[in-house]
C-alpha cells in the first residue's frame, strides 16, 4: 500500500465547518504516520437563484439568492493500514460531504 495515494475531496456550505473537518483529517493522517498534502482550497461554486417578488405581475421587482459551495482537497501520499483504519473511524460534522478515491 506504500505506492498508493488517497484523495479526499470535501464540500460544504459553511467554510468554518469545512476547515475544521480538513484539519481533523490532516491531524489524524499525520498521527498515523502518513505523508499529507493539503488541504488545498478549490474554487468556490456559486449558484444564484432569481425569483419574482410579486405573485402575478411586476416583473421588474426581483430578488436574488445565492448558494456557495466551498471545497477542499487533501492528498494522503503514503497511507499506512493504520491511516485507513483511523480515517474510517473519524467522526465528522453532518454538513460536510466527503468523497474518497483510492
Curated annotation (Swiss-Prot):
Pfam families: Ribosomal_S10
A GO molecular-function descriptor: structural constituent of ribosome
Matching SUPFAM superfamilies: Ribosomal protein S10
Name of the protein: Small ribosomal subunit protein uS10
Example of a GO biological process term: translation
Presence of keyword Ribonucleoprotein: yes
Cytoplasm is among the record's keywords: no
InterPro entries recorded: Ribosomal_uS10 (IPR001848), Ribosomal_uS10_CS (IPR018268), Ribosomal_uS10_dom (IPR027486), Ribosomal_uS10_dom_sf (IPR036838)
NCBIfam families in UniProt: PRK00596.1, rpsJ_bact
Function field: Involved in the binding of tRNA to the ribosomes.
Entry-linked PANTHER family: 30S RIBOSOMAL PROTEIN S10 FAMILY MEMBER
Species assigned in the record: Bacillus anthracis
Domain of life according to the entry: Bacteria
Family as reported in the entry's similarity comment: Belongs to the universal ribosomal protein uS10 family.
GO cellular component assignments: ribonucleoprotein complex; ribosome
Oligomeric and partner information: Part of the 30S ribosomal subunit.
The organism's taxonomic lineage, starting at the top: Bacteria, Bacillati, Bacillota, Bacilli, Bacillales
Keywords: Ribonucleoprotein, Ribosomal protein
